[in-house]
């Protein structure tokens, strides 16, 4: 619509949802260590193999610790202070390589917490050993690191990923920087691989978005960016990941100590990117005047902080509401023709 004259603006909007996430610290837990007493979120690396008889019991008890309290009120729960990844070594060479980073790794299942600060071996009849390991790691006094991770679906098997890292301490005169190592695990919550009981793994590892050293200056944010393409990566059988489903992808990222003077390589912080549940109707018919486009959004681990939208290459605009949102789209601001509408949901 131009100068008040009613014309058709066809909104062939691309249903492209950008999900941006940062780690939030939410109170409330029935585990031994209250969530508010955690110094950082804890990562568990579950080393497993599809032929391993005792691995399913380990996986299920890890999952009991992770899954939402609202759905499973009798299970322990750490809100968003604990995440784990299943590193299935007989189907993924990078998972097998990661096992080689631990000199004391001897068999399956083995779960390393925070890069080896705690280790639990063997099948498990309950969650107690995992809870104790998580509590011990979560209470560890350590370097103050802020960490965020974002992911956006670019269509098909292409995922844009950004990591934001800040060292929140003053550097010393002799050592003004901090050396770390970042691993961003791309996982499928419902894995394409089945365990010995013929059930899908929880958070089965596919590949790293980032797997590299990082040098931090005091109080300065470092931003890493990449575009991960599933078809460019394969498992041990030579099968690529071009068939990924964005709704079945999470990214868990951990920043590890890599200082030469340090006696350990423990994880200092962990964050996550999980696509939200979004119900939104992307219009395909002709729009005019000011169009009201509504939807809902929810996240299994945190609350929704904001909903933003933009048209084509314009600026991001804030929608009204969060869990229930309303986009007031002024079609008079755009020329006649097809346009691209993008949503960005942040926790």
Task: Specify the residue positions occupied by each region the protein language model found.
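Short helix-capping segments at alpha-helix termini
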Residues: 72-77, 338
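Long, low-complexity serine/threonine/glycine- and acidic-rich segments characteristic of extracellular
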Residues: 276-347
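Short, conserved sequence motifs used for protein processing/export or organelle targeting and
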Residues: 39, 76-279
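Short, well-ordered amphipathic alpha-helices
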Residues: 29, 62-67, 226-229
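Secretory targeting signatures
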Residues: 1-35, 52, 295
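Boundary/junction segments of secreted and surface-exposed precursor proteins
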Residues: 22-43, 279-290
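Local sequence-structure signature of Cys/Sec-based thiol-disulfide redox active-site neighborhoods
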Residues: 33-72
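Conserved beta-strand and immediately adjacent loop positions that scaffold enzyme active sites
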Residues: 43, 110, 181-183, 252, ...
């Amino acid at each position: 619509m131009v100068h008040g004259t009613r014309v058709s603006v066809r909104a062939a909007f691309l249903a492209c949802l950008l999900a941006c996430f940062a780690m939030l610290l939410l109170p409330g837990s029935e585990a031994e260590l209250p969530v508010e007493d955690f110094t950082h979120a804890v990562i568990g690396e579950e080393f497993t193999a599809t032929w391993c008889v005792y691995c399913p019991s380990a996986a299920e008890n890890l999952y009991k610790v992770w899954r939402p309290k609202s759905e499973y009120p009798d299970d322990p729960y750490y809100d968003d202070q604990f995440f784990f990844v299943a590193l299935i070594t007989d189907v993924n060479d990078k998972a097998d390589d990661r096992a080689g980073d631990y000199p004391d790794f001897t068999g399956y299942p083995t779960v390393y917490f925070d890069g080896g600060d705690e280790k639990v071996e063997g099948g498990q009849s309950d969650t107690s050993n995992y809870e104790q390991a998580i509590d011990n790691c979560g209470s560890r006094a350590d370097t103050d690191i802020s960490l965020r991770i974002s992911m956006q679906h670019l269509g098909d098997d292409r995922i844009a990923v950004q990591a934001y890292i800040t060292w929140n301490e003053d550097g010393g005169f002799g050592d003004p920087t901090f050396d770390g190592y970042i691993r961003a695990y791309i996982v499928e919550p419902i894995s394409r691989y089945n365990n010995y009981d013929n059930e899908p793994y929880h958070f089965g590892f596919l590949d790293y978005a980032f797997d590299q050293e990082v040098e931090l200056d005091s109080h300065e944010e470092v931003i890493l960016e990449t575009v991960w393409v599933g078809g460019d990566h394969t498992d041990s059988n030579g099968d690529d990941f071009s068939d990924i489903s964005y709704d079945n992808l999470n990214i868990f990222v951990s920043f590890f100590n890599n200082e030469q003077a340090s006696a350990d390589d423990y994880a200092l912080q962990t964050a996550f990117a999980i696509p939200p549940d979004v119900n939104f109707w992307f219009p395909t018919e002709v729009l005019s005047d000011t169009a009201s486009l509504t939807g809902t959004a929810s996240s299994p681990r945190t609350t929704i902080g904001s909903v933003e939208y933009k048209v084509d290459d314009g600026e991001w605009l804030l929608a009204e509401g969060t869990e229930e949102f309303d986009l007031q789209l002024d079609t008079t601001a755009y020329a006649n023709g097809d346009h691209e509408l993008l949503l960005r949901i942040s926790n």
